[in-house]
């Protein structure tokens, strides 16, 4: 699978994870909404966002990321807690979604190099996060990587 297809899967997954966090909705319904809303066909996006189309998105990876984060969110939260400078409940919901996604990839998807996980999380934070979210996400993941992944 091409790296761009996984990047697109992450792009959709972060939005779906954020939606799940905000609504606490059924993850299968959220996933179906993303699959049926033509989001994989034509996504209105910022100029620097990737072009998102079904042939260019790894749908299996999207499914794995979304469901993996939802099913393991408590474990992921406990793994990130030691690296946070503030309580989990004080995190912005998008920062929390970004960190959960990255922690999932770092701990459950060892086929993805940790440097790729960190770089992709930073890029997503630049697109979806607040002004300095990418710096915060980078700091947390840089501290967590040596413990969670043997470099």
From Swiss-Prot:
The keyword Cell division does not apply. Signal peptide: none annotated. It holds the Pfam family NusB. Gene3D superfamilies: NusB-like. GO terms for cellular component: cytosol. GO terms for molecular function: RNA binding. Keywords: RNA-binding, Transcription, Transcription antitermination, Transcription regulation. One of its GO terms (biological process) is transcription antitermination. Belongs to the NusB family. Involved in transcription antitermination. Required for transcription of ribosomal RNA (rRNA) genes. Binds specifically to the boxA antiterminator sequence of the ribosomal RNA (rrn) operons. This is Transcription antitermination protein NusB. It comes from Photobacterium profundum (strain SS9). The lineage of its organism: Bacteria, Pseudomonadati, Pseudomonadota, Gammaproteobacteria, Vibrionales.
């Amino acid at each position: 699978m091409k790296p761009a297809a996984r990047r697109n899967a992450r792009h959709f997954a972060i939005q779906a994870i954020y939606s799940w966090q905000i609504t606490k909705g059924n993850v299968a319904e959220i996933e179906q909404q993303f699959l049926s809303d033509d989001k994989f066909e034509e996504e209105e996006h910022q100029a620097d966002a990737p072009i998102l189309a079904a042939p260019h998105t790894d749908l299996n990876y999207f499914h794995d990321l979304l469901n993996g984060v939802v099913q393991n969110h408590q474990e992921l939260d406990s793994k990130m807690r030691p690296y946070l400078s503030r309580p989990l409940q004080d995190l912005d919901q998008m920062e929390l979604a970004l960190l959960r996604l990255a922690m999932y990839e770092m701990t459950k998807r060892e086929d993805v190099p940790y440097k790729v996980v960190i770089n992709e999380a930073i890029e997503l934070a630049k697109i979806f996060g607040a002004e300095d979210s990418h710096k915060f996400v980078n700091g947390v993941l840089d501290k967590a990587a040596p413990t969670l992944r043997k470099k």
